[in-house]
Amino acid sequence: MVVPLYVIRHAHAGSRSAWLEDDRLRPLSDKGWQQAQALAERIAPLGPSVLLSSPYKRCMQTLEPLGELMGMTVQEEPRIEEDSPLERSLAAIEDAPDNAVLCSHGDVIPGFVNGLIRRGMDIGEGPHALRKASVCVLHHVNGLFTHAEYWDPPSI
C-alpha cells in the first residue's frame, strides 16, 4: 500500500534581514498565518497521524492551526531544523510514521528530496524551488520512497 508523508516548507515569515533577534524566534507574518490556516484546512481531511516540526518558531507556527483543527500537539523534530546535515534529515523522514506532516526549511527539504531521488524516488516534473507554504508529498511503500508530488502554496 502506498502511504504519504506531507512535508511543508514553513509559511511566510518576516524578513530575515530585518529581524534583529535569534533567527530561531522569527515568527510568521500575517500572510504566513493565513497560509498556515489554509494549509490546515487542506491537510486536516487527509487524517495526519502526527505533526513534526523543526523547532524554529516559524515552522512550529505553520503547523499550529492544523494541530488546533485536529486536536493534536505539534512535536519538535530537531533533525529537520535549518542547516541540519543530510543524514540527520533523511533519518527523520525515514523514521516518520505513515501519514505524518512535517514542517521544515527551504535549505533542508531539497537536500533530503535529492537524497531520496538518488535512492530511486521519482519526482516527475517537480519544482525548481520550494516556495514558502508549499507541500512536497513523499509516497512510500514499505519504507521505500517511490515518488513525490508538489503542491503549490495556498493562494492568499
Stretch-by-stretch model annotation:
Residues 148-156:
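Short, solvent-exposed aromatic-acidic interface loops
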Residues 120-147:
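Domain-level recognition of soluble alpha/beta enzyme cores
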Residues 45-47, 94-98:
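Glycine-rich phosphate-binding loop signature in dinucleotide/nucleotide-binding domains
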Residues 5-6, 97-107:
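Generic beta-sheet signal
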Residues 2-84, 122-123, 133:
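Active-site-proximal alpha-helix that buttresses catalytic centers in soluble enzyme cores
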Residues 106-107, 114, 118-125:
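Flexible, glycine-rich active-site loops centered on histidine and acidic residues
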Residues 81-93:
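Short alpha-helix plus adjacent loop in nuclease-associated cores
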Residues 13, 87, 108-109:
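Short active-site segment of divalent metal-dependent hydrolases/proteases
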